[in-house]
């Protein structure tokens, strides 16, 4: 074994020898060397620091401090890991009866010092669970004993290190408490949602248990509470018997049809109501109304619209309506009759595409969206429209219908002369117009009416060099108003020079009887002078059409409005003989209310053409048989045979 540190009396060995030698040298009285202090006392105090062991103590202190800091940091990491996994820490029994922060906070919040008393910080303000190796508490106890048995320097160092660890632990515990408060709020909201869902689940379960059918099989759920509907299915749980008996009378002022069933369960009377209101209502409005009538909370009701296209659901309402468990009043909804009554089953037919095209042709609808929207609105009165809504290829049907309708219209327009086309347009406009405002407006602009009729007759016939009318004048004189009203009546097309960079900007002229270019500028006049002289003459031109080869057509009559008189401008001498110019000199007049004095609309143009039909030399070719039926009516759908039921 090693010798113990220090001296313990006179023994054999080096230590005892040094002690004897010192005594002998002191007694012999020999000369003392200069290195020794002759004033030193003989008490032996000069040998206290002879062996320097401070280095050993410092090393031990550093190791212990590092271990303590490491343990504190591991404790913090464990706390964060546990809080991240659990999210919710239940309160311990010890803290259940405490006040203040310890009453409402987590178990670790009790280690946070909130008073002004001087309390020594603990080594571990937050409890750390055992790591699993079984020696965590032993190491903590040994570390505390070592700290108490060291010198002052080590105590100060350990207190500083423990203070740092304690402050870090306090901050971590405070942040954990904040996270717990946020998690508590989230948990409360989740509990509220769970509570509401559990009530709804209970209502649905009781309904299926009582009525023997799932409520969700009878309805089509609405996600939004703002969606409006006239027909609603309502479940009400916990209704008193007296209120359930009087509900049929209470609901009549608000509805036009009601189907009421009442059965008893362990939660009270459970009602099932199919109702059609007088006007559309959303779920929130229906919920408030029924809550007042039934005297139950809104959470005790389930409200959804019924399935309208399910034959099974319609049969359920029809059969239960005939039984003695239901009370029904009002007219049965059409969606129930169509799927249950025999006559409606006979009316159901397979979708006829030709009938849909005929409808679009008769109503002069060629736009895809208009065809889809307006034809779907006929589903209640038209069996073919109802069959169209049941189809899974509605988009393709609509696109094909619009394409076929445009083909028929284009061919029909192509085979009409200008007189037939004007008569065709007049037949689609109501009577009651007056031709006088048009004549008065021309006279107001100092335009001779006879000269205008002569030029207008040649314009409509497309005579070369007379195929283009130019309305020239300063701004705000009514040029565009006059020209646009005529184009609107004749169902012409308007082309704009802004699209001249495109190869297809003249394509609308291929499907029109009359065309118009509004507000022609000098740049546009230059373009017309360079590339469109033959178009102004009314001759055949070649037009680039999208997705097709070049199309050769006769250019329809053109109306141009401009602020530049190209008929006399020397910059375009080759246009002088191709233009018929009418000068609009005076500003367009308005009355005190801002309305035009000379109103020019479709009805007035119809009256104008009817009045000047002979002067314009518009000959209508009538092709009628002896019975007076017009053979020119186009039919694109096959005829129908009347079906009869044989007994």
Swiss-Prot record:
It comes from the Viruses. ATP binds at residues 473-480. The keyword Phosphoprotein applies. It is an enzyme of class 5 (isomerase). It holds the Pfam family PPV_E1_N. The modification Phosphoserine is found at residues 92, 106. There is a cross-link at residue 554 (Glycyl lysine isopeptide (Lys-Gly) (interchain with G-Cter in SUMO)). GO terms for molecular function: ATP binding; ATP hydrolysis activity; DNA binding; DNA helicase activity. Phosphorylated. Keywords: ATP-binding, DNA replication, DNA-binding, Early protein, Helicase, Host nucleus, Hydrolase, Isomerase, Isopeptide bond, Nucleotide-binding, Phosphoprotein, Ubl conjugation. It catalyses: Couples ATP hydrolysis with the unwinding of duplex DNA by translocating in the 3'-5' direction; ATP + H2O = ADP + phosphate + H(+). One of its GO terms (biological process) is DNA replication. Residues 88-107, 146-178 are annotated as: Disordered. Residues 149-169 have a biased composition (Low complexity). ATP-dependent DNA 3'-5' helicase required for initiation of viral DNA replication. It forms a complex with the viral E2 protein. The E1-E2 complex binds to the replication origin which contains binding sites for both proteins. During the initial step, a dimer of E1 interacts with a dimer of protein E2 leading to a complex that binds the viral origin of replication with high specificity. Then, a second dimer of E1 displaces the E2 dimer in an ATP-dependent manner to form the E1 tetramer. Can form hexamers. Interacts with E2 protein; this interaction increases E1 DNA binding specificity. Interacts with host DNA polymerase subunit POLA2. Interacts with host single stranded DNA-binding protein RPA1. Interacts with host TOP1; this interaction stimulates the enzymatic activity of TOP1. This is Replication protein E1. It comes from Human papillomavirus 52. The lineage of its organism: Viruses, Monodnaviria, Shotokuvirae, Cossaviricota, Papovaviricetes.
């Amino acid at each position: 074994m090693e010798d113990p540190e220090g001296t313990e009396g006179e023994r054999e060995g080096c230590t005892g020898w040094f002690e004897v030698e010192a005594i002998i040298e002191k007694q012999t009285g020999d000369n003392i060397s200069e290195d020794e202090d002759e004033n030193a006392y003989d008490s032996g105090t000069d040998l206290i620091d002879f062996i320097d062991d401070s280095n050993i103590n410092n090393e031990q202190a550093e190791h212990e401090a590092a271990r303590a800091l490491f343990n504190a940091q591991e404790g913090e990491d464990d706390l964060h890991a546990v809080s991240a996994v659990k999210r919710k820490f239940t309160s311990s029994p010890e803290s259940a009866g405490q006040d203040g922060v310890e009453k409402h906070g987590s178990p670790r919040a009790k280690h946070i010092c909130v008073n002004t008393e001087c309390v020594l910080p603990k080594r571990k303000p937050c409890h750390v669970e055992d790591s699993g190796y079984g020696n965590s508490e032993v190491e903590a106890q040994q570390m505390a004993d070592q700290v108490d048995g060291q010198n002052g320097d080590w105590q100060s160092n350990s207190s500083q290190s423990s203070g740092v660890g304690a402050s870090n632990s306090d901050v971590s515990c405070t942040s954990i408490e904040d996270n717990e408060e946020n998690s508590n709020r989230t948990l409360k909201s989740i509990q509220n949602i769970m509570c509401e869902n559990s009530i709804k689940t209970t209502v649905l379960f009781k309904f299926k248990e009582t009525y023997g059918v799932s409520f969700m099989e009878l309805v089509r759920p609405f996600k939004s509470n703002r969606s409006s509907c006239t027909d609603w299915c309502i479940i009400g749980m916990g209704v008193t018997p007296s209120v359930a008996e009087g509900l049929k009378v209470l609901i009549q002022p608000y509805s036009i049809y009601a189907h009421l069933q009442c059965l008893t369960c362990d939660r009270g009377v459970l009602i099932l109501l199919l109702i059609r209101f007088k006007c559309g209502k959303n779920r929130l409005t229906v919920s408030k109304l029924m809550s007042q009538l039934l005297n139950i909370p809104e959470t005790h009701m389930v409200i959804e619209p019924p399935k309208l296209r399910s034959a099974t659901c319609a049969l359920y309402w029809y059969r239960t309506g005939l039984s003695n468990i239901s009370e029904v009043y009002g007219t049965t909804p059409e969606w129930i009759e169509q799927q249950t009554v025999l006559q409606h089953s006979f009316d159901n037919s397979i979708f006829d595409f030709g009938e849909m095209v005929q409808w679009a042709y008769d109503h002069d609808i060629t736009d895809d969206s208009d065809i889809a929207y307006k034809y779907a609105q006929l589903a209640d009165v038209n069996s073919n429209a109802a069959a169209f809504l049941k189809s899974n290829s509605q988009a393709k049907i609509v696109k094909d219908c619009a394409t076929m309708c445009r083909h028929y219209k284009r061919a029909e327009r192509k085979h009409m002369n200008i007189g037939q086309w004007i008569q065709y347009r007049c037949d689609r406009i109501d009577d009651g117009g007056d031709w006088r405002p048009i004549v008065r407006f021309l006279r107001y602009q100092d335009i001779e009416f006879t000269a205008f009729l002569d030029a207008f007759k040649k314009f409509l016939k497309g005579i070369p060099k007379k195929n283009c009318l130019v309305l020239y004048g300063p701004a705000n004189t009514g040029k565009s108003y006059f020209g646009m009203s005529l184009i609107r009546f004749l169902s012409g097309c308007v082309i704009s020079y802004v699209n001249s960079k495109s190869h297809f900007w003249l394509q609308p002229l291929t499907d029109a009887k009359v065309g118009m270019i509004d507000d022609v500028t000098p740049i546009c006049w230059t373009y017309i002078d360079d590339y469109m002289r033959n178009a102004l003459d009314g001759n055949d031109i070649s037009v680039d059409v999208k997705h097709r080869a070049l199309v050769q057509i006769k250019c329809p009559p053109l109306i141009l409005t401009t602020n530049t008189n190209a008929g006399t401008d020397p910059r375009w001498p080759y246009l002088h003989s191709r233009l018929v110019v009418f000068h609009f000199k005076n500003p367009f007049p308005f009355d005190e209310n801002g309305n035009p004095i000379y109103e020019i609309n479709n009805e007035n143009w119809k009256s104008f053409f009817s009045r000047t039909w002979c002067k314009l030399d518009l000959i209508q070719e009538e092709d009628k048989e002896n019975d007076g039926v017009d053979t020119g009516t186009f039919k694109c759908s096959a005829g129908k045979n009347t079906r009869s039921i044989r007994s």
